[in-house]
């Protein structure tokens, strides 16, 4: 990927309406075919922060990378992950789903920041190639093929006898399966299966043996796909990882290490994308919802409550989010929440803070200073009527535009004065009572501290006396 276009700066530029010099179908990772995304606006101010995923500094590249590892037979998944952690000298590592010690194949290992995506990878679908040993000969290959195809859809499974989890009946889905090869003389069958995460292939082999009426068990197993990465997507061995780190340590050549490790964005290629303005990136990293003004481009076919990925103009993944608007709404609305964050991926303060600089935010700050809003920005008795009518708090799910107050006939000035006087006296009383409560609480706290200090002094004296008595007795 890195050698495809060495001189090209992979970035969505402002007002990029004309076609790019190179075909965007060849652009890497999350920027692939970005010109086919629907455009909300082409105007934004680029901020010289962050890097394209393929051009990150090597330390950052390793700590936000994933490895598509070909797990060797015999060591457990946890041992392999611990070895990778030790070789690369990273703080954290995680994997995409446990493989039994004797099983080989795809094991996606996530480093440091990429471990935030481990949960989504563990729940992703898997594909296996399995060798089934039958306990007796079967009449024909067709019977085996039909039995394998019969065991598709939702199946009841109980974990095998040798398992680390409770042997509880569970339902798992087999999406597709097909026979690859059958040897009747040796009673061996090789088949491929695409299944849900958490499916026990060992149990499936036992069920196939029962279905054929001869019994059977799993002879050998290999995982050929985990989530969006398969064994054809630059799979590497433990020796490759060790050699790449050795070459970098001794020759400072990082090219081999960059080929072994791939950016975390490669795990998010299957998600629908929403491109965010640079000025809105850090707010999302702090947990804010993405609003319409921060939106640049979006994918067609987004549905409400669908999982999407929020990306920067340089193709970096900011967060995995949940869409709050469909594609149709995004094209027509001029305000509202686009998506809320499910799992933040980017570190905070990679991009500068840009929130609180708009006209509405500045007005809100001045009202807070003048005491016309409370410290949380909520209206109080001093809040101007025009502010409460016009301002909508999107953090409040029940927030609506305030309706204008009904017109009331002006009352006599004497009555108004009396009402104001009563309200003022009530306010004074409430303030005085709260001050008294605070004073009483402070006095109680002082008394408690004095008592504790006296107790400590007594205990110290008693200890000293005991020590002196012991010395005298000796």
Swiss-Prot record:
This is H/ACA ribonucleoprotein complex subunit cbf5. Keywords: Isomerase, Nucleus, Repeat, Ribonucleoprotein, Ribosome biogenesis, RNA-binding, rRNA processing. The keyword Isomerase applies. PANTHER family: CENTROMERE/MICROTUBULE BINDING PROTEIN CBF5 (PTHR23127), H_ACA RIBONUCLEOPROTEIN COMPLEX SUBUNIT DKC1 (PTHR23127:SF0). The active site is at 100 (nucleophile). One of its GO terms (biological process) is rRNA pseudouridine synthesis. Sequence repeats lie at residues 443-445, 450-452, 454-456, 457-459, 460-462, 463-465, 466-468. Residues 368-378, 423-434 have a biased composition (Basic and acidic residues). It comes from Schizosaccharomyces pombe (strain 972 / ATCC 24843) (Fission yeast). Residues 446-474 have a biased composition (Basic residues). Residues 271-346 form the PUA domain. It is found in: Nucleus, Nucleolus. The gene is cbf5. GO terms for cellular component: box H/ACA snoRNP complex; cytosol. Residues 406-419 have a biased composition (Low complexity).
